[in-house]
Amino acid sequence: MANTAQALKRIRQTNKARAQNASQRSTIRTVMKKFLKAIEAKDIATAEQEFSTAASLLDRAAQKHIIHKNKASRLKSRMHAKKKALVA
């Protein structure tokens, strides 16, 4: 257990940040699942909309160091390839 006021404060800050980061990661996963469902249903309009939302969330998460920038780029690339295959 933390003994100093500084250590107690750092624990509070870490727990708060962990909760916020987990929430954002969960939101990203949810939007990506919606995108994949739209792809499976061959719904181009919904897929376009969900791709845009997911790409935006991924970029923001990478910018805030919630996920690595290369991971965000890789996920966007894979989603774009699936969207392109659906349209073609």
UniProtKB/Swiss-Prot annotation:
Compositionally biased tracts (Polar residues): 16-25
GO terms (BP aspect): translation
Record flagged with keyword Ribonucleoprotein: yes
Disordered: annotated span: 1-25
Keywords recorded for this protein, A-Z: Ribonucleoprotein, Ribosomal protein, RNA-binding, rRNA-binding
GO molecular function: small ribosomal subunit rRNA binding; structural constituent of ribosome
Classification via InterPro entries: Ribosomal_bS20 (IPR002583), Ribosomal_bS20_sf (IPR036510)
A Pfam family this chain is assigned to: Ribosomal_S20p
Alphabetized SUPFAM superfamilies for the sequence: Ribosomal protein S20 (SSF46992)
NCBIfam families: S20
Function: Binds directly to 16S ribosomal RNA.
Record-stated family: Belongs to the bacterial ribosomal protein bS20 family.
Xref: PANTHER family: 30S RIBOSOMAL PROTEIN S20, SMALL RIBOSOMAL SUBUNIT PROTEIN BS20C
Name this protein carries in UniProt: Small ribosomal subunit protein bS20
Species per Swiss-Prot/TrEMBL record: Dichelobacter nodosus (strain VCS1703A)
